[in-house]
Amino acid sequence: MALSLVAAACGDDATADDAAGEAAAEGEGSSTAEERCEANRAYGPVTFVTAFDFAAAAGIVELIAADAEGYFEELCIDVEIQPGFAPSNGALVIEGQAEMGMAGSFAEVVNNNVAGEGDLVAVLHWGRTAIEAIVVPEGSEIQNFADLCDSLVGIKGDLPFSLQAAVALSGAERSCFEETLLDGFDPVAHLDLGIDALPVYKSNEPNALDGAGVGYTLLDPLDFDVPASFGVPFASQSFLTENPELAEDVVRALIRGYEFAAADPDAAVAHAFDLIDAAGNPMFFAQETELFRWQTESALIADLAPAGSGVGIPDVALFGAEIDALVDAGVFAEAPAWEPMVNADIASGLYDGTTLIWPGR
């Protein structure tokens, strides 16, 4: 597969002209296709640490698809997919144990940098809203985030950033409701405990509740204009600075992996399960639930993608609004200097209009 790039650079004059045009499209001063291929290969493995094992989630499924479909190989890139969990995967990249990872949101990237004095940079951005929401039992008087005051909210670890922002933007304070830590991941069992509200992922727990016939109301930050994001692949600034063309090609392959996964969800989930099953499925994933996860997330991505823009290009204005909301919520003691933590130029430079530029295609 990698030979396709070499052939494009070393074939007849017409083919060579095509390759030169492709190189020019990728940016003035780019190396030839052959040189770029050899440089990518010479780098060795690029380690990407996932945010939730091998789940079919945005930020993970396109990575798996790109590898399985040979897109990295076509660009002479050796990618090692390491199962991990957010936000600790960010620490591995900060420490230099991996080149890239995926965050649940841009806020998570910023928080990792602030807490760990890191140099993480968001290079793609799939979801332009929160993937989290609040579930309340059917018939509850809680109709908005301000209504959470004086209620009992079940928490798994911590309240997600997007929901902290939603509470703050409603005019309420997080301290106005009681929180109780929950064990396990069964939303049916959690609601049976008598809690008033449960933070969930829109691409996960609602499916389980629907399957069990449990009625509920979903408080979705999207319905309350809460600025948020999900599915945010990142790299270290040092990797981007030292290997700009390799970084471009990794992002290029990820975008093509997303296109494949969006067009063929069943095949994308099947690719994920090749890795899940090979690892012994320690998270007890089921194909039906992972298909629901990816169909839900890809629908949100498609529904909110701006017209006339290439998919995956980071929305810098939205990122700024997301961080401002969290400053107001008290998540950050002071406004962090977030602007260097996103690079939208890499992804935007890989498009001709809304068409991904791919060598030889």
Q: What are these model-predicted stretches?
A:
Residues S4-A9:
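C-terminal motif of bacterial Sec signal peptides marking the signal peptidase cleavage site
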Residues C10-A20:
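Bacterial lipoprotein signal-peptidase II cleavage site
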Residues G27-D183, P187-V200, L219-D220, P227:
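Short, glycine-/small- and polar/acidic-enriched structural segments
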Residues I81-Q82, L120-A122, E179, A261-A272, ...:
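Surface-exposed patches in mature extracellular/periplasmic domains of secreted proteins
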Residues S140, F185-M283:
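Pocket-lining segment of extracytoplasmic ligand-binding domains
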Residues N243-V331:
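Secondary-structure end/capping motifs
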Residues A317-R361:
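Conserved C-terminal helix/tail region of periplasmic/extracytoplasmic solute-binding proteins
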